[in-house]
UniProtKB/Swiss-Prot annotation:
It is found in: Mitochondrion outer membrane. GO terms for biological process: mitochondrial genome maintenance; mitochondrion-endoplasmic reticulum membrane tethering; phospholipid transport. Residues 336-351, 387-399 have a biased composition (Polar residues). GO terms for cellular component: ERMES complex. Component of the ERMES/MDM complex, which serves as a molecular tether to connect the endoplasmic reticulum (ER) and mitochondria. Components of this complex are involved in the control of mitochondrial shape and protein biogenesis, and function in nonvesicular lipid trafficking between the ER and mitochondria. Mdm34 is required for the interaction of the ER-resident membrane protein mmm1 and the outer mitochondrial membrane-resident beta-barrel protein mdm10. Keywords: Lipid transport, Lipid-binding, Membrane, Mitochondrion, Mitochondrion outer membrane, Transmembrane, Transmembrane beta strand, Transport. It comes from Aspergillus niger (strain ATCC MYA-4892 / CBS 513.88 / FGSC A1513). This is Mitochondrial distribution and morphology protein 34. The gene is mdm34. Its main location: mitochondrion. InterPro entries: Mdm34, SMP_LBD. The keyword Hydrolase does not apply.
Amino acid sequence: MAFNFNWSPLMADASFYTRAQELLTAALNKSPKPPIIVDDIHVTELNLGSIPPELEILEIGDLAEDRFRGIFKMSYTGDAFLTLKTRVQANPLNTYLLTRPSFATPLPVAAATPLTIPLQITLSDFKLSGFVILVFSKQKGITVVFRNDPLESLKVSSTFDSIPFVRDFLQREIEGQLRVLFMDELPAIIHRLSLRLWVPEYRAGEEMANRATNTAGEGPGQDPLASPPQDPVDAQGNALDESEIASLSLDSSVETHSLFSQKNLLRLAALTDSQRTLSLFTPSIQEVVYRAWTSPSDAGEVSGGVMSPLSPVLSRTQSQVGGMSSFHDTASMVSSQTRSSTNTHTFSSYGLSLGAGRHSKSNARRRKKRVVDLRRPKTTEDAVSVSGESTYTETTSAPSICSAPLPVVSEQTDDPVTPPLSPDSELHLPTVPERHRLSISRQMPRRDIATEMLRETGESSAQPVNHSAVDVNATPRVAVHPYIAAQHESEKEEASAPRQLPSKALPLSDAKPTSSIVDQALVERLAGEIARRMREEKLTPGNSCSSFWDRLSHDDAPPAYGQ
């Protein structure tokens, strides 16, 4: 079954061609164009010819007065033609650079200059063949769907027919665009045209939309060259005269000069260099070093010679060979800086911290005795009793009074926190373990205990039996500033008590018979207190080196001596 079309009414209707040209122009510019086409594609001429297409009915699904659905086989070989106008880029290097990233191209200057020329293309000798699904309804118009690519061939005539390369390129590109047009855009165009012919509501709404568009577009256009800037320059930065500005217009040439104000250029340059970064949105934050400043010269300018309190620790950690002892050095330096009683300078605390770190490293491998025996070598029973209390003795030999030599404390100064200033003192401290040697000022609380005991003993020498009761009432409390209290106490006892208590204040050989009982009781109490405190520090979890200083931060007083 076949049909014969009356093609003459379509050829006679002028409004149909006008509307079809507008729809084709919008459809050709909607799809992404190749980079060689630098302007919009305009349909200047459209003619459907005098030869109608041939339709063969393959299937009819629905047939009524106001609706129809069927599948057809269409073939067309006629004299229809279509004329297009656009502008193309004649320099292929410019097109190549536009489609490649800037960091991957050599960025030529003269060779990449754009050259645009007008182009007129005429499409004729269409040959179409394909299967079409046609659905007709007076309420919804005509819907046409191509099940395959209907374009077989066409003829492309252009301005560059004399150049074979350009002719073949245009033929290939236009064929690709027309295949997309037939599959996607042409069914939409036919549907809109059918709605305009058979649906009055759609026609009225379209006319109202066109009227609103024309009203908005009325009035003279604004010329950006009417009010040029005060100091205009061209794209190369050359200043322009008033005569040159007056000669410029929007339609004077293909490429209009870009006018920029010199003040705006300076502002853009300052904005580009903002915060010494390439980001235009870098916030302005005071006293902040950006990553673009992290060069040796910029780092020196930013610091200004001021070192933070923790900078010596960083310098010390980087200046030695990495190992397990680095952690001991850092801990000793941090403890010496945080325990300083006055606001000393950073470099002085750094020097003292280095000395403390060397002592802790030298005594790291020598751990022999954990108990310092301060008793007199008089009887054996006393030694047995003290060694029974202590749990830190690590030797298997019989308890001896002289087994642990007394350390020669050579850093007897008024400042209880000051560590040794030179590495010579490490020869005099061989038996102090490293876990208790990290904070050297631990000897000062022991010296204060001995001083208090001597003073209490001197005041109550006639009543040696009531030592425990008096000691409970006179227990020294930990003050908020323990270092200042220790300093005043040491100055008060400077004339009465000797300075080197661990080795000289206790009379061992030339003591008088009248004070032998008092000295013996004092030594026993002092040794028991030291052993008990060291035992508590060993059993306390965490860092045992700083347990004594951690107890100073509590408000509770230490327990009474002898308990």
